[in-house]
């Protein structure tokens, strides 16, 4: 099934477009969505991401995938805990990380044309750094937003923050994993 899905560029493009569309839909309508609907859309997104990421098992050696996953899990857990426990104000990081992410996207698209292994390596290193920062920033921001909603007694906001927070941290985790895998990866 995996070979059939990924042998068609149209299907791959459709999977990626569906993921992007769901992220944009969830982000744009979070204030209006019922929490159950938001979590349902997040679940659909996670399933689509799982199908898309399954290609790594055909490209990378299993040991490399395990190494990248272990490194990702350790880094992600450490940065999430740091974000939840730090007393420092991280709000200034938000715009810097967002601008860096836009630059990363531009560089990634440019490398589709240049096919430069050096640029691919630089993009991967930058991606790890950016998503480490986003993990720290998002963890802190989700904690602060949740605390504010709890103080206000807004249970609906707490549920919505939980759904969008899950999506943000999931995206941070997956992207961190993909960039770490790209750095340590031994292709078959």
Question: For each predicted feature, which ranges?
Answer:
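A hydrophobic alpha-helical transmembrane-helix feature that marks the membrane cores
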Residues: 1-188
């Amino acid at each position: 099934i995996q070979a059939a899905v990924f042998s068609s560029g149209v299907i791959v493009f459709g999977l990626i477009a569906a993921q992007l569309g769901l992220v944009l839909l969830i982000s744009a309508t979070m204030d209006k969505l019922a929490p159950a609907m938001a979590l349902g859309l997040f679940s659909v997104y996670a399933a689509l991401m799982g199908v898309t990421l399954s290609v790594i098992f055909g490209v990378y050696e299993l040991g490399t995938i395990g190494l990248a996953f272990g490194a990702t899990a350790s880094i992600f857990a450490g940065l999430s805990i740091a974000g939840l426990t730090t007393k420092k104000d991280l709000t200034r990081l938000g715009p810097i990380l967002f601008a860096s992410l836009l630059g990363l996207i531009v560089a990634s698209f440019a490398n589709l044309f240049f096919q430069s292994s050096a640029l691919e390596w630089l993009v991967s290193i930058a991606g790890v750094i950016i998503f480490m920062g986003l993990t720290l920033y998002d963890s802190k921001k989700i904690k602060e937003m949740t605390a504010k909603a709890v103080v206000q007694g807004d249970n609906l906001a707490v549920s919505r923050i939980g759904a969008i927070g899950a999506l943000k941290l999931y995206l941070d985790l997956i992207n961190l994993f993909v960039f770490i895998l790209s750095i340590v990866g031994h292709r078959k």
